[in-house]
Amino acid sequence: MKRLPLHLLDEILFNLDPKSLGKMRCTNKSINTHISDDPNFKFEYFSRIGSSLLHISKVGSKFLCFYPYAISRLFKNMTPLKNLCNILGSCSGLVLLSINGILCVANPLTKKFRFLHYSIWGNETWIGFAVDQIDRATQRFKIVFISEQLEVSNPYETTYQFRINTGESWSLSKTTITCRASNLKKGKNSKPVYVNGDLHWLRKDGSIVAFNPETEKARLIQSQFNRKPGKLLLCTGDNRLTLISATDAVISVYALETDGQWILVRWIKNEVVHQSLPLLYWNVQAYDGKCLLVRMMSLVGSVIHRYDLRANKWRVLGSIPTWCDADRDFFLFKPSWSSVIGLLDQEHVHVLMPMPMPMPMPMPMPMHMHMHMHMPMPMAMPMPMPIAMAMPMPMPMPMPMPMTKTETETVTRSEVISSVMAIMGLVNRTLSFIN
């Protein structure tokens, strides 16, 4: 092996799965040193490695499940947390977390993270997570909070506003976009997607709101093409915005071209739907251009099926524990060894971490909105429901509820940091072969 040219050795190692690469470290001292100490090898290997799968309850949970790449087993890799956790996004090796309502950006591979001075209670679907690769070894992140507001003067139009955070503070973008009224899609398959510099939110009518956090330009992307009614998933594949349209018979993959046109790039026969009878529920959960994940729920349990686009084959990826609730968020996770601007080691984060606090003052409302809110309620309108039962009203910026004193007292800095470290440790343990 010592006589083998380094570039040939790298090509061999790059094609190994994580488990096999870990075994290679034990065969030769020089290979072990090369894998563990050469940063260029790490950057290249993690750029080629396949995606792992994270999933957690959509309403938050103290248990996070992780399915590492190329390891054949059930979804047994899980970790208990001290606090309620949500995963709000996963992009380029980073994860955006909400720990008891406190936002945190973390890189599980490098074990660096950062808390943001903002607490989120509800409306997590409206948060977009963007990560840019500045150079081979450096990344930076941005978080965008989108709000929707029905126009009082024209109830057939909706206006969107954007608030941006780069790690230090929140700023209100001067950009707004007004378009035909339709609410942002919530619930299943509603997570925003970041690709080619733009964050994308799917609306109920199938159109997409796009916003560039760097240029602060917004646009509406239409998706009116020949697709049958079915399940929709907004995602990214081969560095293009992708829309999955799935029925019991076929799963169609559409990609957005640079000219704004959608093209059909893949047609997949939905074989697994008919193999999982009696079937209670199914849905397309994730896609990255290389694989497609479909979840099937039957009377005997819940199973994730994986379609390999290169091999054109379906296979069972794993089963989900029976104690997991049906409504779950799934994220494909691809680790990154890059240094991220703003992320810190644990000893520095402990000092900078914000305690849960009341929310900042809401954004100023447009004058016509103030006038509308102070107008007398017409007699024909029903009396408002109690706050606990009322439906959320359109606001210029949906403001999360502040934590109560009791909740603040029960959430300590050490507990929140412990939960973040446990999440990163769950992923990092699987990839410890290279650290």
Swiss-Prot record:
Keywords: Kelch repeat, Repeat. Residues 1-49 form the F-box domain. Kelch repeats lie at residues 192-238, 280-335. It holds the Pfam family F-box. The keyword Acetylation does not apply. PROSITE patterns: FBOX. InterPro entries: F-box-like_dom_sf, F-box_dom, SCF_F-box_component. The keyword Cell inner membrane does not apply. PANTHER family: BNACNNG10540D PROTEIN (PTHR31672), F-BOX DOMAIN-CONTAINING PROTEIN (PTHR31672:SF9). This is Putative F-box/kelch-repeat protein At1g20790. The lineage of its organism: Eukaryota, Viridiplantae, Streptophyta, Embryophyta, Tracheophyta.
